[in-house]
Amino acid sequence: MAPGWAGVGAAVRARLALALALASVLSGPPAVACPTKCTCSAASVDCHGLGLRAVPRGIPRNAERLDLDRNNITRITKMDFAGLKNLRVLHLEDNQVSVIERGAFQDLKQLERLRLNKNKLQVLPELLFQSTPKLTRLDLSENQIQGIPRKAFRGITDVKNLQLDNNHISCIEDGAFRALRDLEILTLNNNNISRILVTSFNHMPKIRTLRLHSNHLYCDCHLAWLSDWLRQRRTVGQFTLCMAPVHLRGFNVADVQKKEYVCPAPHSEPPSCNANSISCPSPCTCSNNIVDCRGKGLMEIPANLPEGIVEIRLEQNSIKAIPAGAFTQYKKLKRIDISKNQISDIAPDAFQGLKSLTSLVLYGNKITEIVKGLFDGLVSLQLLLLNANKINCLRVNTFQDLQNLNLLSLYDNKLQTISKGLFAPLQSIQTLHLAQNPFVCDCHLKWLADYLQDNPIETSGARCSSPRRLANKRISQIKSKKFRCSGSEDYRSRFSSECFMDLVCPEKCRCEGTIVDCSNQKLVRIPSHLPEYVTDLRLNDNEVSVLEATGIFKKLPNLRKINLSNNKIKEVREGAFDGAASVQELMLTGNQLETVHGRVFRGLSGLKTLMLRSNLIGCVSNDTFAGLSSVRLLSLYDNRITTITPGAFTTLVSLSTINLLSNPFNCNCHLAWLGKWLRKRRIVSGNPRCQKPFFLKEIPIQDVAIQDFTCDGNEESSCQLSPRCPEQCTCMETVVRCSNKGLRALPRGMPKDVTELYLEGNHLTAVPRELSALRHLTLIDLSNNSISMLTNYTFSNMSHLSTLILSYNRLRCIPVHAFNGLRSLRVLTLHGNDISSVPEGSFNDLTSLSHLALGTNPLHCDCSLRWLSEWVKAGYKEPGIARCSSPEPMADRLLLTTPTHRFQCKGPVDINIVAKCNACLSSPCKNNGTCTQDPVELYRCACPYSYKGKDCTVPINTCIQNPCQHGGTCHLSDSHKDGFSCSCPLGFEGQRCEINPDDCEDNDCENNATCVDGINNYVCICPPNYTGELCDEVIDHCVPELNLCQHEAKCIPLDKGFSCECVPGYSGKLCETDNDDCVAHKCRHGAQCVDTINGYTCTCPQGFSGPFCEHPPPMVLLQTSPCDQYECQNGAQCIVVQQEPTCRCPPGFAGPRCEKLITVNFVGKDSYVELASAKVRPQANISLQVATDKDNGILLYKGDNDPLALELYQGHVRLVYDSLSSPPTTVYSVETVNDGQFHSVELVTLNQTLNLVVDKGTPKSLGKLQKQPAVGINSPLYLGGIPTSTGLSALRQGTDRPLGGFHGCIHEVRINNELQDFKALPPQSLGVSPGCKSCTVCKHGLCRSVEKDSVVCECRPGWTGPLCDQEARDPCLGHRCHHGKCVATGTSYMCKCAEGYGGDLCDNKNDSANACSAFKCHHGQCHISDQGEPYCLCQPGFSGEHCQQENPCLGQVVREVIRRQKGYASCATASKVPIMECRGGCGPQCCQPTRSKRRKYVFQCTDGSSFVEEVERHLECGCLACS
């Protein structure tokens, strides 16, 4: 559904619900209330996708369907569904539910369908569904359930569909399914089940679907029954495979012979399990009824703990709240430690029922208040530590049940006072800590000093913080008479026993007694924190313009008088005075109010005086003062009232005085009633007078005769409603449509109560500011405009907005506060803009958002956009359409599915991206122009003198800018279009002297020398062996002055240069390298090798002798060090460890002497390793470990009659087996391996099956093959790539076959568990190096090996140089194409001529250019051939020289791949499908298919799955009536 229609649908549903509610009022009892934010229709309650954290209250008792899916509910309590006796369908899927209290469903007697999938349930409580006998469908899939207790499903005997797949189930207790006799569908796939008891499925006679695949079944003698059971029911339990023992791994359970199901012991008992024993939370440890979760990084209290625990330790975590009933079910708890967390919220019943609890430790948290009743019932508690929190008050009955408490610590909190009697219940208290609290030692704390003097139990030294006279003095040592109250202190702390400490006087205000005076302080809003004791609030003479509905008066029960005179109030929001029932006097004199109505004064039920003097009120209507029945004095003096409608004062039943003076009354027929009313009531102050018509001017209204109140030519009334729909728009109820009207601003006359506004397809360049006044809007469509920028708080007043459509505009930047205030927004569409980045925090206020459209935006996915990736993944609010555009490694990746760690910042961000939020950063203003941001034009330039234009690039005097290049002279000229002409120096030409003619076109360079163009000349670059200005002289490199051979080497002249014949001991092209003969020396006993020319000598340690120091001195041990006789290979270093020699291997080598090379790194483009062939037995496997960050490549390849390939494809491992006698078979791994870490890959061949196992996960099988795949003697194995000469000739190629080699590391290759040694690399294995490190020398290109230890770089387009670090020069710069376009061809260019021109430089005009003017093409277009002749290119369905003949209706067969989208996976047919297209003429009829048939095709998907679908194919075409 499109976002725009979603809003319409919501409006229709809302109106339908309203109509149903009205019908209910007229025809029966009053409608039942609906929970806040939910939608109720008939017996259905829809609360899905609202971000709810708990089940809402107030669900109608008659509800039959309840949708609570896609919220954030974490716990289901006993009271959540109490009383819902008619409920039949309950949806709770896709929440965060981890705990369901026993008895949560006890009232749901009629429940038939319950969905709890996609939650976080770990344990299923027994007897949970005992009270839901009519349940027929139960979905518990995609949770974290670990075990199924015996009584889990007791009571639901009618259930037909039970889904338990995709959990962590490893234990199913005996009898768990015994009562489910009507069960038809049971899903247990994708769990951890290893054993199933023989009685599990015996009581399911109606079972027709059973899924057991993707488990860990152990096929021993105890599972033999399942094989028989499945063989008798071939349609159920398909693909159920054995995972152990090893010799049965991958076999179908039903296909294994009974004799193979054996146990080690002949009479072993079937293993049993206990579902409750596995309920210890995964990060914790459980032993001796103690649960230890210390320092595990927990964010919440673990659920489903072992029921018999006596102690739980949760300190040093990140827990923020203790939910309701968190520990209630653990009745044996004695000790709870939750110290050093982040707890700020504790439910009142968190510790309810813990009568055995003796120790409760809560120190080091962020607790600000102890809720009422938190410690009630903890009669055994002896230790309570509340220190190091932020507790600011304690109710007098907080500790009422703690008679046995010995130690109480309130040290280091925010307590200012303590209520008298707080410690009275603590009969056993021995130690009390109160220090480090900011105590206010006034009259209310006098009792504490007396208490501590009588009971010296406070040992921490509690002191006063204020007042100053008592600051820093010990409370227990201060005399009672010094504790006294003064000023407003008594009001502030009077109710401290109820945890109420009144607020201090607001900033900028003055408080005296109960008067709060905030007048004349330039305030723009009412202070948000006012003391509760205030009775007189003075806010006059400020700058308040709008009275917001903040609920401030609900907190002021003592308020009697409000003075808001002399402000700038233009609007009073509905509900602004809610809770102000005690207010008796309201002054609004001297403001700018134009209209008022009864809803404005809602809440002022006790108001007696209302002053509205000196405002701009023009009309008093029937509802202006509705609800003000207590008002006695009303002043409307000095307004602009011209009309008062009859009955305007009827609701003012207590009115005794009204002032209507100084108003311009229009005494026409609309005011005739007022004169009679004034004469009758006699409560008016003064005599209000007429101002219109002229003949009644200044006459008192009550004196005007009734016949003089006429409307002849004077029907004006200020109370008449203005038109409710703008001219350019159409309106229906509260929906206004102004689409495609060419609007550049919001039209005037927009109804204030509009709920849906459609402004798409106009020319708006910014979001109209006037929209902020339309507070009832629920949908705004601003798509297909020209809006280029949003501002902060653009939509902050639109609290009801649920749909905002900004697609297909020119948005480049999203300010961080642009969407602030949109807490009701559910759909936000930003599709099709130019947004590259979204600042973190932009969506903080979008708490109700369920759909975000960000597609077709050039997102720059670096580390600054990582938060958005995490946010999108957490809530699945973006449907997987938004793609990254940059940086290059992230291009075309999906925002939803790309791993978060790939969002990285590397190097500076392109200035064009940064400048989207500040266009001035790209320095668009030239010639020292000053740049300023502009919300419409993006930027504006203030140009210096002599320049003009948008970017200050146009000179007022064209020659000031020196447009002539290369020293040309500028001349002002009116005859040229640019206003100037250039006189060029010798060697340059062109309008601006920008062209350097190519002097090499006619050069005299000889011997294939390269000509380099200069300025009016050229230079010849000679090849080797030639010199001279024209390279016409041969060089003799062996003459003494040119001989480059070093170290007495012999120079030998060659045809193309020379070579050096080195003397022994030297090497290199010029014999420049002195060979180090010590590289392979044989010096022993630690002797030092000294290199000499063509040899070396050994410098022996003292006492040793011989050429190689091989003779030890007499009378000494031959071995002075264990390493002396221990030779490490491959350059390894020998070290002594515990008196034993040990080799420290270089990267990639292993073995006792580092003799084996087990890790190699593939860095070249065509790198590979060839392994010697070995016959693989019928039971064999190949395993290896890989590490890479690339998406594609060849891991392993076997080429013979049965080609086999193990490939890296889009980050997954793909196994392809291509027997030439059958279609190729492919299987994909679920796991991705391109994260740079090592992953294990195993290929198992067993009994004509081929299985792929990645990271020891679930095997992926190719199924039963026609014959056993094997690696023959003559079929080599290639790792990391294949020889370029071999290609993939033996393996049939598909469109997605990765032809490139593998880039990364391969480690520990084993064939039949035999570790392979890479040490003797074949000579063709180029670009393969020991160890694991990547080739990084090529800056902008790929490595390609040329020698064993050498690589060359293949550069990406636009880069050149040996290391691809030089930006390539565009060969088209300075091109000489006259009438054509320059096209680069490598380092040169060619000219693509315009029509009518030819030649190498497009400088020859063809005479046939206008030949098409006389050559008519009836159904096609005329073109000129290469020979200059005209010809017709016909439209489809026509032929002939002039396209005059209509082709008959025929079918043309094309072959192409058919594609389908399946979720987030893209699927395509395995081969191209022949498709017939009908083309040709049929006169008045149409060329259409006349016969077709359907055929099944196999579709393969990118996620590794496949499916079969029927596709319709056309067979014949003919002429039929057009449909």
Curated annotation (Swiss-Prot):
Biological process terms from the Gene Ontology for this record are: aortic valve morphogenesis; apoptotic process involved in luteolysis; atrioventricular valve morphogenesis; axon extension involved in axon guidance; axon guidance; cellular response to hormone stimulus; negative chemotaxis; negative regulation of cell growth
Residue pairs linked by disulfide bridges in the UniProt entry = C284-C293, C441-C464, C443-C485, C505-C511, C509-C518, C667-C690, C669-C711, C920-C931, C925-C941, C943-C952, C959-C970, C964-C982, C984-C993, C1000-C1011, C1005-C1020, C1022-C1031, C1038-C1051, C1045-C1060, C1062-C1071, C1078-C1089, C1083-C1098, C1100-C1109, C1123-C1134, C1128-C1143, C1145-C1154, C1305-C1332, C1355-C1364, C1372-C1382, C1377-C1391, C1393-C1402, C1412-C1422, C1417-C1432, C1434-C1443, C1449-C1487, C1467-C1501, C1478-C1517, C1482-C1519
Stored InterPro entries: ConA-like_dom_sf, Cys-rich_flank_reg_C, Cys_knot_C, EGF-like_Ca-bd_dom, EGF-like_CS, EGF-like_dom, EGF-type_Asp/Asn_hydroxyl_site, EGF_Ca-bd_CS
> Which keywords does UniProt give here?
Developmental protein, Differentiation, Disulfide bond, EGF-like domain, Glycoprotein, Leucine-rich repeat, Neurogenesis, Repeat, Secreted, Signal
Report the glycosylation sites: N72, N192, N563, N622, N784, N792, N797, N928, N1008, N1025, N1181, N1247, N1406
Annotated LRRNT domain ranges read 34-61, 271-307, 496-532, 716-752
> Can the keyword RNA-binding be found in this entry's annotation?
no
Subcellular location as annotated: Secreted
In which tissues has expression of this protein been reported?
Answer: Predominantly expressed in thyroid.
Q: Where do the Laminin G-like domain residues begin and end?
A: 1158-1332
Q: Name one Pfam family in it.
A: hEGF
Protein name as it appears in the record: Slit homolog 3 protein
